[in-house]
Amino acid sequence: MFVAKSGSRFPEIRFSTLGHRVLWADANESEQTVISYLTRSDPERRNVTDWVRREQRRLSNEQPDEEPAEYDIVLRDVQAVKLEFWSWKDQDWQDTWDTTQSDGQRGMLPTRVRITVTIKDHNDKDYKLSTQARILMQEPLLAIP
């Protein structure tokens, strides 16, 4: 699963991965996890938005927002975030990506994700930072006996 929705200053992205590390013996969790990147209002400062990473370690069929999860702040006081996804098939950047819909990119991951964040510098001016993350796996992982 890889779902990314754009259209505002702060897009949301949610994907499943086998990258969770189980740290305690007999923990009721596995290496499978769902990661989300989204914004949250800073509870200590008004009108401040933080970019956070959410990890849901125990998967279920409930809505993701209703399940317990760990939140880690990635960037404090972010002004904007832009996510773009490189489609090797179309040779173009896409604003959204959804592997769960038949009219989306079913069974296909982007080869790269371009992440651009806007923050305020020490002079209170917008400052943009951009990087790209390469996704090495493009094919779905199917467990067919």
Placement of each model-derived feature along the sequence:
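Extracytoplasmic beta-strand-rich oligomerization domains located immediately C-terminal to a leader/signal peptide
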Residues: M1-Q63
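A short, structured loop/turn motif at beta-sheet edges
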Residues: S8, T39-N47, I73-A80, G107-L109
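Short coil-to-beta-strand transition motifs
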Residues: E31-Q32, A69-D77
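Short helix/strand-bridging catalytic loops that position acidic/His residues to coordinate divalent metals
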Residues: E62-E70, D98-Q101
